[in-house]
Amino acid sequence: MIRHLLSSADLDAGTALQILDTAAEMATVAGREVKKLPALRGRTVVNLFYEDSTRTRISFEAAAKRLSADVINFSVKGSSVAKGESLKDTALTLQAMGADAVVVRHPASGAPYQLADWVDGSVVNAGDGTHEHPTQALLDAYTMRSRLGRLAGLSVAVVGDVLHSRVARSNVLLLSTLGAKVTLVGPPPLIPVDIAAALAPSAAVCYDLDAVLPQSDVVMMLRVQRERMNDSYFPSAREYARRYGLDGSRMRRLPEHAIVMHPGPMNRGMEITSEVADSPRSTIVEQVANGVSVRMAVLYLLLGGNNR
């Protein structure tokens, strides 16, 4: 197993499948009366979040606690970071505390790589700028395999704001490694061809959502990150929804077995309607639940847990 999880590119097919298989074992813990394993007793996991996050931070905290690890949640607000402390000095503090693993979310792309150079423990990238979010890709792959029984050969449409999406980058890399066929869909300004080519030469690009729906096993809708863009990317929210939003009418053009995913948080009424988000095809709630199992697997394998 690798020492850090910084990018989906760190994972070959064998390692990725090992994580997914381990996650399936971890999922059985959720059904127990006592939802705990002693695997990481005595280990310390630090959640170092420089950006606000509800889903991801709580998911990692739950994962570590279910493995009996000691968890330290580091909040930037009110900390030395708010007073100007550098990432390196924070890393040295964590090193002195003996952190076995650091889960980091940071607004700067590449920050987890720097952190990995400064601490002896394992580093897990929980999202760095617009770069990557590998555990989200793993939980998405786990959800697809749970619903559809396989990953190899699946046709996956990743729709929306690819340009600003770390989730899209990690998913394209991981799904391509696992044999899925990925098509990026969205307005041309949000899918630069050079980005698609750099991510995975096998990924296709299409600017017409309606053209890809009948052939898609999975449609992954991305949040439109309006905080990272200006009005030049598309005319209006209404126009975006008309061209690239997934509503009930479009959902009915999907194959009968197809599923709809969204990493959250959603802009209901923009990239996805409530009819779709709350439908039986939607895996959005499952993705949250599966995230805990997948992150348990990642921490367990990175830290060499035992005594399951």
From Swiss-Prot:
Involved pathway(s): Pyrimidine metabolism; UMP biosynthesis via de novo pathway; (S)-dihydroorotate from bicarbonate: step 2/3
PROSITE patterns: CARBAMOYLTRANSFERASE
Subunit structure: Heterododecamer (2C3:3R2) of six catalytic PyrB chains organized as two trimers (C3), and six regulatory PyrI chains organized as three dimers (R2).
Functional description taken from the UniProt entry: Catalyzes the condensation of carbamoyl phosphate and aspartate to form carbamoyl aspartate and inorganic phosphate, the committed step in the de novo pyrimidine nucleotide biosynthesis pathway.
Binding site for L-aspartate: K83, R166, R223
Catalytic activity: carbamoyl phosphate + L-aspartate = N-carbamoyl-L-aspartate + phosphate + H(+)
Documented EC number(s): 2.1.3.2
Positions annotated to bind carbamoyl phosphate: R55, T56, R105, H133, Q136, G264, P265
Keyword Cell membrane: no
Name by which UniProt lists this protein: Aspartate carbamoyltransferase catalytic subunit
Family the entry assigns: Belongs to the aspartate/ornithine carbamoyltransferase superfamily. ATCase family.
Superkingdom, taxonomy of origin: Bacteria
GO biological process: 'de novo' pyrimidine nucleobase biosynthetic process; 'de novo' UMP biosynthetic process; amino acid metabolic process
InterPro entries for the chain: Asp/Orn_carbamoyltranf_P-bd (IPR006132), Asp/Orn_carbamoylTrfase (IPR006130), Asp/Orn_carbamoylTrfase_sf (IPR036901), Asp_carbamoyltransf (IPR002082), Asp_carbamoyltransf_Asp/Orn-bd (IPR006131)
UniProt KW keywords: Pyrimidine biosynthesis, Transferase
Gene Ontology molecular function: any one: amino acid binding
PANTHER family per record: ASPARTATE CARBAMOYLTRANSFERASE (PTHR45753:SF6), ORNITHINE CARBAMOYLTRANSFERASE, MITOCHONDRIAL (PTHR45753)
GO cellular component: cytosol
